[in-house]
Amino acid sequence: MKRFIIAPLLCLTAISALAWGQKGHDVTAAIAEKHLTPATKAAVDSILEGQSMVYWANWLDNASHTPQYAYTKTWHYKNIDEGVRYEEAPANPAGDVTTAIKAQIETLSDPKAPFADRQLAMKIIVHIVGDMHQPLHMGHATDLGGNRNKVRFFGRDANLHSVWDSNIVEAGHKWSYSEWRDQIDRVSPEEAQAIVDGSVDDWAKQSAAIAANIYRQTPDGTNHSYDEVATWTPVIETQLLYAGHRLAHLLNMIYDPAYAASFGK
């Protein structure tokens, strides 16, 4: 599985929040569940009251459109405009995907935080770690993360963001989310270690670099057909795999002292 070793892979004002579509988020959560340590799994089960991470994987996409959780709308993405370095991207005062991930980690790490706050943080982080790995959720504010980029998918009108959310996922493999998990999550322990190295910001930079490459290779009017599906499906496989392993890693670092100690924490 050498294609999954971390390397420079090909290296949004209101933006569509549906990163990966339902299946992609389910895949991320399913992979993460597979890599929770027993201590972490017990903690997650307690916080989610016996429901799975997959059960909650897509909850935030709907919740963000309700008055109660409208404040989370900007937490699904981070805007990195063309020619702007990740470190120089202006901060969104309402928050973005990276600041939101860090905030949920802080809440989940606080044993004194109210249970309801920790449960909400779990539901949120299960989703937005996946969002961060959808490259166009690190896209340009000027085109709403590809939502304004008009392309075609097998001859039908589409936008670049929707193509990456679900069209290529569905065209690449006719698998259920559990089949996706079983087929792409076949890395060695050494490869798994490489995947989780780095920080949330390091991982976000990787997604932003992929987004920049997508923009370069996909001018407006591009018709995505078999060649494009063949080109981009391995990238999607990698991003979903990384998202699942990294989500598990973040939770293991919080809930399993022995795991954290193995990383010098």
What are these regions (language model features)?
Residues 14-16:
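N-terminal signal peptide c-region/cleavage motif recognized by signal peptidases
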Residues 10-11:
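Short, linear, compositionally biased motifs with a strong N-terminal bias
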Residues 1-4:
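Positively charged n-region of N-terminal signal peptides that target proteins for export
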Residues 18-128, 135-265:
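N-terminal, motif-rich segments that launch catalysis or mediate targeting to/interaction with membranes
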